[in-house]
């Protein structure tokens, strides 16, 4: 698909510039308005995930990218609905897994749970000497998930996102990404789908189709990098020692036994 080819090209570009962990947005495989999700959903053994994983293996990097996997079938209002999981694919050398979004986006007159089965499990993985936790989009409104990931050892939390635009939504996004970094004393790497229509549509209600403004926030809530409404690639050096230092001076996270 076109999305897949764009994703592969961006991964290759980022890896060529030295990236070790590459984070793409929620719904990288296809956006929420590209047709019925259940008709496009693929397993982790399907062509989208295996193409990402093959390139990650070749480049010796770890990639996180949003996709949809078949989940369950429910009956609602006399209709049979094949729901999907909103999955953050995690792919790298010898690694092929995923995190299923726990908090479905049932807000602002939208009900993701009608078509998406909520996940149940926290997920963390290693990249070099870094422990990375996973969350997706609406999860960022739930600080306990981020604190629990940090208590389990996560030093950085990735957040693939397709953040709906509208009045105040960019301000909320900026506040929430900084707040979750402070709550968890972790780096936050939040990759958002770019805004359809770019700056010209900024602030107009859009549904879950992206607001751009991908960002990297350090454990002290300082924004290290931020994109605009358009496509971009952000880079940052991640220092585990900065996490350790912050957690010594601001001990708000209790390590799990």
Language-model regions, residue ranges each:
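Short, acidic/polar
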Residues: 2-12, 141-147
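Cys-nucleophile CN-hydrolase/nitrilase-fold catalytic domain and related Cys-dependent amidase chemistry
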Residues: 5-92, 98, 164-186
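Short beta->alpha transition motifs characteristic of CBS
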Residues: 30, 37, 89, 99-105, ...
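Short hydrophobic-aromatic micro-motifs
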Residues: 22, 131-136, 158, 188-189
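Short, basic/aromatic-enriched C-terminal tail that caps enzymatic domains
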Residues: 235-257
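Short beta-strand scaffold segments in enzyme catalytic cores
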Residues: 65-67, 86-90, 123-125, 214-216, ...
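Active-site catalytic loop in hydrolytic enzyme cores
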Residues: 54, 73-152, 165-175, 179, ...
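CN hydrolase (nitrilase-like) catalytic-core segments centered on the catalytic cysteine
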Residues: 45-64, 140-234
């Amino acid at each position: 698909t076109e999305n897949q080819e764009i994703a592969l090209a961006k991964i290759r570009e980022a890896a060529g510039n030295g990236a070790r962990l590459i984070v793409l947005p929620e719904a990288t495989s296809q956006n929420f308005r590209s047709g019925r999700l259940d008709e496009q959903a693929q397993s982790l053994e399907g062509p989208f995930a295996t193409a990402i994983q093959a390139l990650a293996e070749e480049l010796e990097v770890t990639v996180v990218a949003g996709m949809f996997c078949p989940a369950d079938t429910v009956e609602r209002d006399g209709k049979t609905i094949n729901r999907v999981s909103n999955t953050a694919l995690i792919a790298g050398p010898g690694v092929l897994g995923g995190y299923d979004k726990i908090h479905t986006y049932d807000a602002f007159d939208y009900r993701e749970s009608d078509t998406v089965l909520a996940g149940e499990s926290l997920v963390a993985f290693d990249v070099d000497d870094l422990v990375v936790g996973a969350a997706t989009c609406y999860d960022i409104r739930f600080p306990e998930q981020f604190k629990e990931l940090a208590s389990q050892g996560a030093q950085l939390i990735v957040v693939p996102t397709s953040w709906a635009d509208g009045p105040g939504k960019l301000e909320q996004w900026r506040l929430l990404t900084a707040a979750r970094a402070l709550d968890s004393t972790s780096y936050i790497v939040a990759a958002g789908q770019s805004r359809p229509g770019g700056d010209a549509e900024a602030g107009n209600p859009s549904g879950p189709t992206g607001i751009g403004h991908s960002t990297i926030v350090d454990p002290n809530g300082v924004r290290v990098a931020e994109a605009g409404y358009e496509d971009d690639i952000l880079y940052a050096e991640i220092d585990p020692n900065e996490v350790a230092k912050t957690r010594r001076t601001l001990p708000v996270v209790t390590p799990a036994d």
